[in-house]
Amino acid sequence: MKEDTLYCLLHLWYDIYDIDEQNRNRGDNMRIEICDRASIVNLASTPFEPDTALISIANYGDSFAELRYQPDALLRLVFNDLPISDDAAKAAQLHTMTDAQAEQIAAFYKRVCGKAKILIFQCEYGESRSAAVAAAILEYASQNGKAVFASDVYCPNMSVYHKVLAALREMPG
C-alpha cells in the first residue's frame, strides 16, 4: 500500500472495513476505502494494488478525478450531493443521484465482488456520497453499514444510501 503518499494529504479520510464473515470464509476478503478527490489523484499517481476496484463520483459540471493509473475495475458517475427527493431535484434540475445510477453501482459491486480485494469509494470531499455508497454496500453485504454512520469523519448522504441499498437488494445475483 502507498501509505507514504496517502497519509501526507490534509484531507485524507481513510477507513478500512472488511466486508462480511461469509466472504472471509470463502477467502473473499475485500477491503473498503473511502477517500476524497485529492487522495485518489495522489493514490493513482502510481499503479494501484492488484485487484482494486474504484467507484469515482464527480459533481455535475466538474471533471472526474485525474487518474494517471487506473484500477482493474472503474465506475465513474456524476451526481450532486443534495439530500432532497427525486421530484424536487427533477423540478429544479439539480442532478442528484438517479435510480439508474444506483443500479449501475449495484451491478458494478456484484460484478467485482469475489474478484476485487480492494474497493475504493471516492467523491469530492470523501465524506458524503462516497461514504453513503460504502455504507450501503457494507449494509447489504454484512449488515455493517452502521460502521460508516458511527464514524465522526463521515456524513453519508441518506438519499444516496437508500437508493443504492434498494438497488442492491432488488438486483439479482
Where are the regions a protein language model picked out?
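Acidic, aromatic-enriched beta-alpha/helix-loop junctions
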Residues: 72-83, 95
